[in-house]
From Swiss-Prot:
It comes from the Bacteria. It catalyses: uridine(34) in tRNA + AH2 + O2 = 5-hydroxyuridine(34) in tRNA + A + H2O. It comes from Shewanella piezotolerans (strain WP3 / JCM 13877). This is tRNA uridine(34) hydroxylase. The active site is at C177.
Length: 327
């Protein structure tokens, strides 16, 4: 059986008429049997899709015929099963949401560092290494000596920079993310804030794992991915983690054996965050999932926003109380 090809792609490029591309792009994906989601915005394209090798090749070839969408940054990995259920092309304000107006990586961006040169850069004691990903991603893997901003979403990253980084003290800053898109936008933001020597890993963690031998690697753990694989190891194969359907946190087999874990309802990370009302909803959703499995169907749907909002609200409350104490 042929492996499913998973293609993560993005490109920051000015697309003033991005709405025009939505329908024909969706048609190309559906005709080729490709599943996954692509985002379109004025600032470019971003997303992860999966299909046969010929289907992915055809998609990239079609995109190359569209103004500005040639030479899209993309990384390929493989899976035994299709990691997505739906085929979607969404129109967005940003292809990766930072929530800061005027940040344009097409105009200002940090220095790209190729995977083969990354180890030397982050081994420099003068370089501050920052992981731009979310807390649940950092939990299962990161680079040696990287700072964890402990952000719940990428929207929180600008505030982390304001509170913790200083262009007069931190002369060299290197950043990384899964595929390169968040750290590219992060470097653009830091440059706008007055940081001079700002670097980011070209192609992200996935490209690093692809090109750097494991015995030479400074990566520790696995890399979280936004599909049903949950995480990939250094060989870019499905890793050891599963995912809690209630809070999206990656979980180990040991955590699944915990009394606090209930399939589709809770895990040790969110057991104290799930309300009785959410629990009822999650139980019903899990019942529908199991019924779908019995019928041989894929159940589509995820209702995790309440738990995520709860996590975010608690973080905001903590920050507020800390600020009040410092006044």
């Amino acid at each position: 059986m042929s492996k499913v090809v998973v293609c993560a792609m993005y490109k920051f490029v000015s697309l003033p008429d991005f709405e025009r591309i939505q329908k024909p792009l969706l048609i190309v994906m559906e005709k080729s049997g490709i599943k996954g989601t692509l985002l379109l915005a004025k600032e470019g394209i971003n997303g992860t899709v999966a299909g046969s090798q010929s289907a992915i090749d055809a998609l990239l070839a079609w995109l190359a015929t569209q103004p500005g969408l040639d030479n899209i940054v993309h990384k390929l990995s493989f899976d035994d099963d299709m990691p997505f259920y739906r085929t979607k092309v969404k129109l967005k304000k940003e292809i990766v949401t930072m929530g800061v107006e005027g940040i344009d990586p097409n105009e200002v961006v940090g220095t790209y560092v190729k995977p083969k040169d990354w180890n030397a850069l982050i081994s420099d004691p003068e370089v501050l290494l920052v992981d731009t990903r979310n807390d649940y991603e950092v939990k299962i893997g990161t680079f040696e000596n990287a700072l964890d901003p402990q952000t719940a979403t990428f929207r929180e990253f600008p505030e982390y920079v304001k509170q913790n980084l200083d262009p007069t003290k931190h002369k060299k800053v290197a950043m990384f993310c899964t595929g390169g898109i968040r750290c590219e936008k992060s470097t653009a933001y830091l440059k706008e804030q007055g940081f001079e020597d700002v670097y980011h890993l070209e192609g992200g963690i996935l490209k690093y794992l692809e090109e750097v031998k494991q015995e030479e690697s400074m990566w520790q753990g696995e890399c979280f991915v936004f599909d049903n694989r949950v995480a990939v190891n250094h060989d870019l194969e499905k890793g050891q983690y599963d995912q809690c359907n209630a809070c999206r946190m990656p979980i180990t087999e040991a955590e699944k054996a915990s009394s606090q874990f209930e399939q589709g309802v809770s895990c040790p990370h969110c057991i104290d965050k799930v309300t009785d009302k959410q629990r009822e909803r999650f139980l019903e959703r899990e019942r529908q999932v199991q019924l779908s499995k019995q019928r041989g169907e894929a159940h589509i749907g995820s209702d995790v926003s309440a738990v995520i909002e709860s996590r975010r609200a608690k973080k905001e409350q903590l920050k507020k109380s800390q600020n009040e104490k410092s006044v």
